[in-house]
Amino acid sequence: ALAEMLGVSRITIRQALNDLAAEGIIFRRQGRGTFVNVDSLNIKVTFSPCMELTQMIKKSGYAPSVRLLNIQKVKREEEICSLLQMQPDEQLVVAEKLFLADDKICAFCRDYFGMNLIGGEEAFDMFSKYEDSIYKYIYELSGEKAQWDKVEIDTVNPAEIAGLKKYVSVKELGLSPYLYLKTLNYSEKDKPLVYANEYFNTEIIKFNLIRQKNIQY
């Protein structure tokens, strides 16, 4: 009945329900049916699905703003170049942005990608002035969409984040540890696009996640 109401196949409905169950938005009770998880409705920011940072800030109840700190060509770091499957002679590029919530430091992002992804050397000057989402720029240029990512989670003292103190003071960063995500972003065709170091002030953005249990009884 639901498939007919929405005009889609049963397979599509089943996949959508599986996705909602994986996110904890609905849960299934054997022999009883499928129910909405009321607790999930109160979650503002979750790890999956991943949303844009400005959207996270809005959902957390703040007004977002973004500062483009720097976009530059940097010396190749072979570990990062290998993760991005870059060409042997391809230039590595890094973009640094600061995200603010009601003018307070909320997150710092350092994104690495290959020069070929943004149109090569001749396009660099134009790109270096681009302040919107890097993923939107890549999509508009190449049609490549960031579809999924692989994340390693850690914590870090904000005063120890390499290179950040040249943009802001230690006092502005606060004293609480930041959540540190090392993220490799992939396209729909499983091609690595951007390697990101993301640092979150969890006094402002609080991540929540509903997890399924897999306990052997």
What are these regions (language model features)?
Residues R32, L53, I134:
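A generic "binding-loop/recognition-motif" signal
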Residues F35-P49:
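Short, cationic-aromatic polyanion-contact patches
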Residues A1-V36:
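N-terminal helix-turn-helix
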Residues S65-Y217:
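C-terminal all-alpha effector/ligand-binding and dimerization domain
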